């Protein structure tokens, strides 16, 4: 089943985010290699197409067997364990995919 995972960054998270990013991306790559990752990405702090530095949070849509597995996976993400995400902002919910773009290019 697909799950929507979202969390907000703490203020001034850039340094912590940069430190935790390689391990965070490795976990996403593992989901991708297993065919379980639909999408993942950060939310820019402000609306600017070239804003790649200042982030306000992240979203992941991935497949897990159940809610508990999705919550456990999210809680073990380096962005959580290294303090990038603000406590109390996590959302992990089941999600039905009713439409998606085929061969989308990001």
Language-model-derived ranges and their functions:
Residues 1-106:
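Conserved, structured core segments of small domains
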């Amino acid at each position: 089943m697909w799950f929507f995972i979202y969390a907000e960054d703490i203020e001034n998270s850039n340094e912590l985010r940069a430190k935790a990013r390689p391990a965070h991306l490795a976990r996403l790559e593992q989901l991708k290699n297993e065919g379980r990752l639909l999408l993942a990405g950060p939310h820019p702090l402000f609306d600017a197409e070239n804003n790649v530095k200042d982030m306000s949070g992240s979203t992941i849509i991935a497949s897990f067997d159940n809610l508990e597995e999705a919550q456990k996976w999210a809680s073990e993400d380096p962005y959580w364990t290294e303090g990038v995400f603000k406590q109390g902002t996590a959302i992990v919910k089941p999600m039905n995919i009713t439409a998606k773009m085929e061969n989308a290019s990001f």
